[in-house]
Design a protein with these regions (language model features):
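Small-molecule-sensing regulatory modules
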Residues: 2-142
């Protein structure tokens, strides 16, 4: 948490041996990482924060903007968003709790990975329609 520039300065000044930050933030801010050794993690190696990388828009329901958003909204991404938010809620987590959650839909199946604050990791796959039950099962096995 905190200012990206401050973190990078502390890394350059030797206050950190290394840091893990979200690549999307650097892309969005236009910050070059050419002077750093960079390693991207896959979701099976390092479970990201829930809903990491999902762009959300909020507006008044029933407005013209609401209708435009419906047109560009990706249904699979929305299901992943809902799944990961359900995980946050079930764990009683917020932005200060180190919980990872990642879901992905392919061929009508959703795969879910959850990592709790102790580092324990659980995962599962099911039909998209059964995602709520899968989340309950995974949470109970943590």
């Amino acid at each position: 948490r905190g200012n990206v520039d401050t973190r990078l300065r502390k890394l350059s000044d030797g206050e950190y041996d290394g840091i893990i930050l979200c690549a999307a933030g650097f892309e969005r801010l236009g910050i070059s990482l050419a002077q750093y050794e960079v390693r991207e993690f896959e979701s099976h190696e390092f479970v990201p924060s829930p809903c990491q990388g999902i762009i959300a828009a909020e507006c008044a329901s029933g407005s013209s903007v609401s209708e435009m958003i419906k047109e560009i909204s990706d249904k699979e991404t929305m299901l992943c968003f809902k799944t990961e938010r359900e995980i946050i809620s079930a764990l009683g987590a917020d932005c200060t709790v180190p919980v990872g959650a990642y879901s992905e839909i392919s061929d009508g199946k959703i795969s879910v990975i959850i990592s709790d604050r102790t580092g324990k990791r659980v995962s599962g796959v099911c039909d998209v329609k059964d995602r709520a039950e899968l989340v309950k099962e995974l949470i109970s096995s943590l």
